[in-house]
Design a protein with these regions (language model features):
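Conserved active-site and SAM-binding loop architecture
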Residues: 1-103
Length: 103
């Protein structure tokens, strides 16, 4: 199975995928420290930084399992709940990536 992740963090999904014998094709994480962790542990996986600037069409039909958790701050009761007015409102970018990848 081929796995890829969006909003990857430090790679919990990648570790689980590896434990199941899956191949980690790519990860996408904007924060520098988590991205460095991912690059260290998964050097054969392509690394993307900014989901808003990444074209995923090259992965169309090549990913079996796509994982990811888009930022929840725009909706969180702990925050200001600005929804689409929050610059962290990235659900539309995740949907675009899903459509391009078509897992």
């Amino acid at each position: 199975m081929n796995h890829a992740s969006l909003f990857s963090g430090i790679g919990g999904a990648e570790v689980a995928a590896s434990m199941m014998g899956w191949q980690n094709l790519f990860h996408c994480e904007i924060q520098e420290f988590p991205r460095k962790v991912l690059q260290y542990w998964f050097p054969n996986s392509e690394s993307y930084e900014d989901i808003t600037k990444t074209d995923f069409t090259k992965w169309h039909g090549k990913v079996d399992v796509l994982t990811g958790g888009f930022p929840c701050q725009p909706f969180s009761v702990a925050g200001r709940r600005k929804g689409a007015d929050d610059n962290r409102y990235l659900w539309p970018q995740m949907l675009r990536a899903i459509r391009q990848i078509h897992p």
